[in-house]
Amino acid sequence: MLQQRTIKTITRAVGVGLHSGQRVELTLRPAQPDTGIVFRRVDLPEPVDIPISAEAVTDTRMASTIGTGGAKVHTVEHLMSAIAGLGLDNIYIDITAEEVPILDGSSASFVFLLQSAGIELQKAPKRFIRVIRPVEVREGEGQNLKWARFDPYHGFKLRFEIDFAHPAVDSTGQCVEFDMGEDNYTRDIARARTFGFTKDVEMLRSHGLALGGGMDNAIVMDDYKVLNSDGLRYDDEFAKHKILDAIGDLYLIGRPLLAAYSAFRSGHGMNNQLLRALLAQPDAWELVSFDSERQAPKGFAQPARAW
């Protein structure tokens, strides 16, 4: 039986929110089988649980936000990407503010945090959402076209193409492919940082956003070049960060996907639209588990791999 996973011990981190600039404490705790991933706002007068789901996503401007009632948690995608990348199914995430800390702008710090806590196999079958026919969402036409799509695949792979007219991006490659069974998430994807332009940062800060952003947690560019003194972590770091975001956004469906995801100029909003479009078509997917590791897609049966 391919088993569910949680973490072995409690682990903690402290940081600031990318947009709020607010100090936040994060506590990750083991959870029982079939709990799923549950964020808990422990700073509120009465703590509020927010289980992840496609329907729990309430805002996708600049980041993925989940919420229930009046309680929200912003910028969940990097942490969710790390959780998905390590194949974890059940975790409680206690948080003392309304935004997940940005840490270094990638998911690498979250991966380290989770691996430090240890991975524990649980006595319950891991359940997947398997895509059994294509599902696609599109917006715009011509130069404004963007789309995202699922196709059937015995595993989970992603292909993402970006389209930024900027010398630094053009020179590094605008398309990346990643296969969870063939490649190594922690080595190939996790260190890719979020990125932005100085002119956009100034505009965002004038609106009370990006208050916690800087060169310590983002790739920052002017009109011509990368301004970070240490340059890029990967040659194609921009497109790889979009893969990182997509892995986190798509895991908000609440279970690991068996599908080939491809996208052109997609973002948090379109990723969530794709999840909702999939769930709205019951004949396009099915829930599956695997009685033996030999039946399971390559990669999912392996223990979470370190750096």
Swiss-Prot record:
Pathway membership = Glycolipid biosynthesis; lipid IV(A) biosynthesis; lipid IV(A) from (3R)-3-hydroxytetradecanoyl-[acyl-carrier-protein] and UDP-N-acetyl-alpha-D-glucosamine: step 2/6
The gene that this protein is the product of is lpxC
Q: Where is the active site?
A: H268 (proton donor)
Which example biological process does GO assign this protein? lipid A biosynthetic process
Highest rank taxon of the organism: Bacteria
Origin organism is: Delftia acidovorans (strain DSM 14801 / SPH-1)
Per its record, the protein catalyses:
a UDP-3-O-[(3R)-3-hydroxyacyl]-N-acetyl-alpha-D-glucosamine + H2O = a UDP-3-O-[(3R)-3-hydroxyacyl]-alpha-D-glucosamine + acetate
Question: Which UniProt keywords are present, listed alphabetically?
Answer: Hydrolase, Lipid A biosynthesis, Lipid biosynthesis, Lipid metabolism, Metal-binding, Zinc
Q: Which family does it belong to?
A: Belongs to the LpxC family.
Q: What is this protein called?
A: UDP-3-O-acyl-N-acetylglucosamine deacetylase
Task: Tell me the residue numbers annotated for binding Zn(2+).
Answer: H78, H241, D245
Carries keyword Lipid biosynthesis?
A: yes
Q: Name one GO cellular component term.
A: membrane
Enzyme nomenclature, EC number? 3.5.1.108
For this protein, the record's InterPro entries field holds: Ribosomal_Su5_D2-typ_SF, UDP-acyl_GlcNac_deAcase, UDP-acyl_GlcNac_deAcase_C, UDP-acyl_N-AcGlcN_deAcase_N
Q: What does this protein do?
A: Catalyzes the hydrolysis of UDP-3-O-myristoyl-N-acetylglucosamine to form UDP-3-O-myristoylglucosamine and acetate, the committed step in lipid A biosynthesis.
Q: Which HAMAP family match?
A: LpxC
In alphabetical order, the GO MF annotations are: metal ion binding; UDP-3-O-acyl-N-acetylglucosamine deacetylase activity
- Ion transport as a keyword of this entry, yes or no, is no
> Which PANTHER family does the UniProt entry name for this protein?
UDP-3-O-ACYL-N-ACETYLGLUCOSAMINE DEACETYLASE 1, MITOCHONDRIAL-RELATED
